[in-house]
């Protein structure tokens, strides 16, 4: 999932997008990207953000879809990769709904017939992703074995952020058990 490193953003999207608001700190030619509370899709940085997050979600969907029927027979390492893909997909969609609200939502590789679908309400996306993250956390270690790897804390932290963003303090988060 090199996509997060390949994007031309040196700073995480959540911080950059805050800078592009009327009250933000960004003073370059893109300073009006978020003026008025909207993101201009004609701006190259916004297009790169949208495309990059969907590339991450699509790659994760390919891994998840290809492995979902074989999870029970997988090695612990393979199950961890499967869970990491689910967390990365959730993070990509979290970034998208944080910036755009309702967005097209896919949980499997997209066919040509599904390419142009409507937007899914962000509440439905959040509900799906919270359940998915709780399931994924079962396959993740508490401490990552390598720098940059996903662990349980990442999954549970993302669940908490989505719960707050979605307006619910009562999300089902296995970390509270």
Residue ranges of predicted features:
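Short coil/turn linking the two alpha-helices of tandem helical-hairpin repeats
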Residues: 97-98, 104, 144, 165-174
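Membrane-proximal, proline-rich intrinsically disordered regions
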Residues: 1-15
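Acidic, serine/threonine/proline-rich low-complexity intrinsically disordered regions
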Residues: 107-109, 157, 170-177
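Conserved, well-structured interaction surfaces
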Residues: 2-4, 24-100, 114-127, 131-147
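Amphipathic alpha-helical protein-interaction segments enriched in hydrophobic
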Residues: 148-158, 162
